[in-house]
């Protein structure tokens, strides 16, 4: 086991991607994947899985602030199930509340408004999701 994890921040138009290492508990963004109504280009995801060979995949689970599910929650679960079904990899859902807010703040701090494009925010959110996962699961 390499200790490599791949994280996705599911969205209907763009899916953020991050790669991380369990040993160092660090993550970095990769290029976001465009999606059409929540359907990604599965060949790009297959390419990522072959290139990085993660032990696990983490998918952000969008929840309301009170912990209840929202319309996007079921779609993120479906995405996670499809990842597992297509590629046979272990997929873990992880609470992503406030990940986009934190990602936007970090990007703005480093690059102002110019840094706040959709793809960079989505992949930065995937980094936040993965770092949060590391904090909770080591």
UniProtKB/Swiss-Prot annotation:
Give the GO cellular component terms, alphabetically.
Answer: cytosol
For this UniProt record, give its keywords in alphabetical order, as a comma-separated list.
Cytoplasm, Hydrolase, Nuclease, Ribosome biogenesis
Matching Gene3D superfamilies: YqgF/RNase H-like domain (3.30.420.140)
Does the UniProt entry include the keyword Hydrolase?
Answer: yes
The cysteines joined by S-S bonds are: none
Task: Write down the superkingdom of origin.
Answer: Bacteria
Whether Cytoplasm counts among this entry's keywords is: yes
Enzyme Commission number(s) from the entry: 3.1.-.-
The principal localisation class reads cytoplasm
Pfam families to which the protein is assigned, alphabetical: RuvX
Q: Which GO molecular function entries does the Swiss-Prot or TrEMBL record give?
A: nuclease activity
Gene Ontology terms describing biological process: rRNA 5'-end processing
Q: What general EC class does the enzyme of this chain belong to?
A: hydrolase
The protein's matches in CDD domains, at most eight in alphabetical order, are given as: YqgF
- Intracellular or extracellular location(s): Cytoplasm
Recorded family membership: Belongs to the YqgF nuclease family.
Q: What does this protein do?
A: Could be a nuclease involved in processing of the 5'-end of pre-16S rRNA.
Q: Which NCBIfam families has this protein been placed in?
A: RNAse_H_YqgF (TIGR00250)
Protein name from the UniProt record: Putative pre-16S rRNA nuclease
What organism does the UniProt record list as the source?
Answer: Cronobacter sakazakii (strain ATCC BAA-894) (Enterobacter sakazakii)
- Phylogenetic classification of the source organism: Bacteria, Pseudomonadati, Pseudomonadota, Gammaproteobacteria, Enterobacterales
Protein encoded by which gene: yqgF
């Amino acid at each position: 086991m390499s200790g490599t994890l791949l994280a996705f921040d599911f969205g209907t138009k763009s899916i953020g991607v991050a790669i991380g290492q369990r040993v160092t508990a660090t993550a970095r963004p990769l290029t976001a994947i465009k999606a059409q109504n929540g359907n990604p280009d599965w060949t790009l995801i297959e390419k990522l899985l072959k290139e990085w060979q993660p032990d696990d995949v983490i998918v952000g689970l969008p929840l309301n602030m009170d912990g209840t599910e929202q319309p996007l929650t079921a779609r993120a679960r479906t995405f996670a199930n499809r990842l597992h079904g297509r590629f046979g990899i272990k997929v873990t859902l992880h609470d992503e509340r406030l990940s986009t807010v934190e990602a936007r703040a970090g990007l703005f701090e480093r690059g102002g408004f110019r840094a706040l494009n959709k793809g960079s925010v989505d992949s930065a959110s995937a980094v936040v999701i993965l770092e949060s996962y590391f904090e909770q699961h080591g």
